[in-house]
């Protein structure tokens, strides 16, 4: 499994992977909801990729949260789930991106034809992008978006 930390080098480091299905999220503990997002990406028949962060976004946004699993554990679990590449920049490096720039990285850097995220996924500067915005933008560009509902354990 490839681990890519430099967002400027994504396209070069994914050479040979072809078109991708990208699972988006902080993936703080890799629970069954996260697995559903990765599974939705993998079931598309494209190269499964996860886009997450080396550090928890909540740490930068005043939440003070930590990951429930270590980076090594997350990478091992992603590999077990069949993810072929993990894009894992520092959150600070992408926090200022406009939602449109984030979409362009997915489309052109990752060659994403399918994207999967949770219903509560937010992205872009000031969390300007959400699942509804992403759905419209993907549809306009011929990509498929899978929004995974929140999973509750009873």
Language-model regions, residue ranges each:
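Nucleotidyltransferase catalytic core that binds NTPs
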Residues: 1-154
């Amino acid at each position: 499994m490839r681990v890519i930390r430099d967002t400027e080098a994504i396209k070069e480091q994914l050479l040979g992977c072809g078109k991708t299905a990208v699972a988006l999220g902080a993936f703080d503990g890799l629970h069954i909801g996260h697995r559903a997002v990765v599974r939705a990406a993998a079931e598309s028949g494209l190269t499964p990729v996860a886009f997450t962060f080396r550090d928890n976004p909540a740490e930068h946004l005043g939440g003070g949260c930590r990951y429930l699993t270590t980076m090594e554990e997350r990478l091992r679990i992603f590999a077990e789930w069949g993810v072929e590449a993990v894009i894992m920049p520092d959150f600070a490096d992408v926090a200022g991106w406009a939602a449109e720039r984030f979409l362009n990285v997915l489309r052109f850097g990752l060659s994403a034809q399918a994207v999967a995220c949770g219903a509560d996924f937010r992205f872009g500067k000031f969390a300007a992008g959400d699942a509804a915005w992403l759905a419209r933008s993907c549809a306009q560009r011929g990509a498929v978006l899978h929004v995974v509902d929140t999973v509750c354990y009873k």
